[in-house]
Amino acid sequence: MTDSSPQSNPNAVPGAADVPAAAEGQQQEQRRGGGRGERGDRRGGRRGDRRNQERDSEWQERVVQIRRVSKTVKGGKKMSFRAIVVVGNEKGQVGVGVGKAGDVIGAVRKGVADGKKHLVKVPLTRHNSIPTLSNGRDGAASVLIRPAAPGTGVIAGGSIRTVLELAGIKNVLAKRLGSKTPLNNARAAMVALSLLRTHKETAKERGISLEQIYS
């Protein structure tokens, strides 16, 4: 009578039949884990993009002037565009930037980037005005700004008005003296805003109390 039971192989490795199944299980687990990691990375990327979009949406930009300029080089004249851009969040931060490029869009983009590099923080009162009178100068341009009562509005013109509005100032009086150049006027307004101090800061610098400032 023949024995129908399977013959044992002396050279067989114990558990060798389970190795492919175990390897396949590990691969499936890695694929599932990798998928979860990739989904997590994608979600994190979306959240980061959303935050950046919200941060960028707070800022407004206005083009004050676009001019075609030329530069004399060895081969002749090289034409390009220059854009003056004012950037602000209407919450007390504003900047003026200048960008040059071979096309208008590129010049505006560079102007926006330059404006965000030169931001000025403006102290605002509860009536969205400025705390004190201030005077700024740039080149031959001079700008005088003074606080105004609620309901007055922004009494200014040109690039000065753009700077004040994007800074978030709602009630102010401004006077331009000297040059009419938009860039000089905008920069003079920026100088005037950068010199502003709150009453608390002024009292601390002078070494007196707030009551003496208000009196």
UniProtKB/Swiss-Prot annotation:
Composition skew (Basic and acidic residues), residue ranges: 29-61
GO terms, molecular function: rRNA binding; structural constituent of ribosome
Assigned keywords, A-Z: Ribonucleoprotein, Ribosomal protein, RNA-binding, rRNA-binding
One Pfam family named in its UniProt record: Ribosomal_S5_C
S5 DRBM domain segment(s): 59-122
Gene3D superfamilies the record matches: 3.30.160.20, 3.30.230.10
Quaternary structure note: Part of the 30S ribosomal subunit. Contacts proteins S4 and S8.
PANTHER family the record matches: MITOCHONDRIAL RIBOSOMAL PROTEIN S5 (PTHR48277:SF1)
HAMAP family from the UniProt entry: Ribosomal_uS5_B
Annotated family: Belongs to the universal ribosomal protein uS5 family.
Name of this chain's protein: Small ribosomal subunit protein uS5
Organism expressing this protein natively: Parasynechococcus marenigrum (strain WH8102)
Gene responsible for this protein: rpsE
